[in-house]
């Protein structure tokens, strides 16, 4: 699976892993269902068949305020990061990330039928912070909303 590329999650993922803390799969705009959110994927450190997906939100200002409040309270915020996607400011919601395997993914393709890719510096920042947040979560802190370790175990068992 290529690095720095964006993906959508399949409907089947939400059927197989019912967790109300997962970001919902489709938004309806003007009566039309759209695949949302899109995700940045990076491989798991232990199992290369499993990827971690970080949802991307266009609600930049909303998440800037939330991140700023966390910085004021804790001195830093690595559960929400910021970058650009297709020339627009975006929030990367590490706090909402989830594990997945390739069959549940669909590449985000642009109008030229090319995969949408991100700047390597943005990807490096998101991946570094996501791995730190995973390490914190493994020590028992509730810093990720979905039950990612339950989903991870189910994915491992299915491989």
Language model feature labels by segment:
Residues 1, 8-34:
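An N-terminal domain-cap segment
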Residues 29-35, 46-86:
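Compact nucleic-acid interaction/catalytic patches
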Residues 67-159:
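C-terminal terminal-subdomain/extension
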Residues 10, 57, 101:
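Residues at the C-termini of beta-strands that transition into short coil/loop
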Residues 13, 60, 104:
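Residue-level detector of flexible, active-site-proximal loop/helix-junction positions
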Residues 38-42:
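Short beta-strand-centered aromatic/proline hotspots
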Residues 1, 43-48:
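Secondary-structure boundary elements
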Residues 5-7, 51, 92-98:
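A broad, low-specificity signal marking well-ordered, structured residues that form hydrophobic/aromatic
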């Amino acid at each position: 699976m290529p690095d720095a590329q964006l993906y959508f999650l399949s409907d089947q993922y939400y059927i197989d892993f019912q967790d109300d803390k997962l970001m919902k799969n489709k938004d309806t705009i003007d009566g039309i269902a759209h695949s949302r959110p899109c995700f940045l994927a990076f491989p798991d450190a232990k199992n290369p068949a499993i990827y971690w997906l970080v949802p991307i939100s266009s609600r930049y200002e909303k998440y800037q305020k939330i991140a700023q409040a966390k910085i004021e309270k804790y001195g830093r915020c690595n559960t929400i990061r910021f970058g650009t996607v297709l020339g627009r400011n975006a929030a990367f919601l590490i706090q909402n990330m989830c594990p997945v395997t390739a069959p549940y993914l669909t590449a985000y393709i642009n109008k030229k039928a090319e995969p949408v890719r991100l700047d390597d510096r943005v990807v490096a920042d998101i991946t570094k912070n996501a791995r730190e947040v995973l390490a914190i979560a493994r020590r028992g802190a509730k810093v990720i909303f979905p039950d990612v370790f339950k989903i991870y175990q189910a994915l491992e068992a299915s491989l």
